[in-house]
Amino acid sequence: MGILGLSKLLYDKSPNAIREQELKNFFGRRIAVDASMSIYQFIIAMKGFQDGQGLELTNEKGDVTSHLNGLFARTLRMIDEGIKPIYVFDGKPPKLKADELEMRRQKAAEAERAFEKAKDAGDDEMMEKMSKRTVRVSRDQIDESKKLLRLMGIPVIQAPSEAEAQCAELVKKGKAWAVGTEDMDALTFGSTVMLRHLNISDAKKRPIVEIHLDEVLQTTGLSMDQFVDLCILLGCDYVPKVPGIGPQKAWEGIQRYGSIESFLESLDTTKHPVPADFYYKEARAFFQNPEVTRAEEIDIQFSEPDEVGLIQFLVKEKLFNPDRVNKGIARLRAAFTRKTQGRLDSFFTITKVPQQTAAARAPLVGTKRPRDGKYVHVSGTLRKATSGHKKAVKK
């Protein structure tokens, strides 16, 4: 879930902290990528629907390969642009997330029932919508994704808990420049730079959204502690929302009272009853001090691709097109042997112009709003681009 409504709120309150970029603009950058989120996106993007049945991208043996196809293609695309991705995988979820995970399971079960109901009614549009809501990333898909990345020579990090928190740790300690994820809580965990839409296909022509935490804090006048409290009030994975407290009330509450404690004291509890399990102090502590492996203990190494291993895994086991795999290996080798060309901004000290706080700045007219974050079905182009694979009815 991330942080509910935070993206739109930042566009409203701190638009200067947000930039739209092209992939090529991140040349030379190390980016810590939320691997589980990326794999989920690839599966959703390649999930089709036809004749009342959900379709998966499979090979000739019937093995689902959408996660490997997407990961292989997008990683190569980043490598081509001189980007150095570091994939971070989720570990054990914190106890605070138990209720959220149970709610997700219930929603998936509801989607299954809604799918069957729509099927009986012959509602293809509703069936396709519900089919995508039942998608889950399996343990086998995670393990295969790790294997592929290691064979490609791309660093893989196993987080002890939340991947976004581990990614933020790498950024805060200078091991990576930004976190690549759709979950806005990467900022709440303290990542100084966050990138959204990093894994969306170039064919959609959707820009990558770059958000700078320091500029958010400077423009809004919030401290980091207050920003964390704001995110908790907006709605996060670890505590329920306070009824009737939307983005604007949460924003005004933190601006006026400075903390969740003082804000709750001001509330009319008959209108806004605080849930008994609103353990905001525990959520705050987790955001401020999450379970991570210290960046200093992580050795990040990019290595040459394992050509024999890639051919064995992708071509012989997963039945990928040999020509496609060989071309991918050539691109990986070229990137590994390419002489490092530094970014211009590494040679200069760049001084940022101070920005006004929210109170001092006049309202901005015509501020750009974020685009819809829905995933668009593009199975047709993907089918064409992945020779040797086909759409098959999900068993």
Swiss-Prot record:
Listed InterPro entries: 5-3_exonuclease_C_sf (IPR036279), Flap_endonuc (IPR023426), HhH2 (IPR008918), PIN-like_dom_sf (IPR029060), XPG-I_dom (IPR006086), XPG/Rad2 (IPR006084), XPG_CS (IPR019974), XPG_DNA_repair_N (IPR006085)
Residues bound to Mg(2+) 2: D183, D185, D237
Main localization, broad class: nucleus
Annotated EC: 3.1.-.-
Localisation: Nucleus, Nucleolus; Nucleus, Nucleoplasm; Mitochondrion
Entry's Gene Ontology cellular component terms: mitochondrion; nucleolus; nucleoplasm
GO BP terms in the entry: base-excision repair; DNA replication, removal of RNA primer
GO function term, MF aspect, one: magnesium ion binding
Residue ranges of the region described as I-domain: 126-257
Cofactor(s) it depends on: Mg(2+)
Segments for region (Disordered): 116-136
Residues where DNA binds: R74, E162, G235, D237
Short name of any one Pfam family annotated for the protein: XPG_I
Processing after translation: Phosphorylated. Phosphorylation upon DNA damage induces relocalization to the nuclear plasma.
Segments of this protein annotated with the region Interaction with PCNA: 340-348
Region named N-domain: 1-108
Keyword presence, Cell inner membrane: no
Keywords linked to the UniProt accession: DNA damage, DNA repair, DNA replication, Endonuclease, Exonuclease, Hydrolase, Magnesium, Metal-binding, Mitochondrion, Nuclease, Nucleus, Phosphoprotein
Assembly, per entry: Interacts with PCNA. Three molecules of FEN1 bind to one PCNA trimer with each molecule binding to one PCNA monomer. PCNA stimulates the nuclease activity without altering cleavage specificity.
Task performed by this protein: Structure-specific nuclease with 5'-flap endonuclease and 5'-3' exonuclease activities involved in DNA replication and repair. During DNA replication, cleaves the 5'-overhanging flap structure that is generated by displacement synthesis when DNA polymerase encounters the 5'-end of a downstream Okazaki fragment. It enters the flap from the 5'-end and then tracks to cleave the flap base, leaving a nick for ligation. Also involved in the long patch base excision repair (LP-BER) pathway, by cleaving within the apurinic/apyrimidinic (AP) site-terminated flap.
Official protein name in the record: Flap endonuclease 1
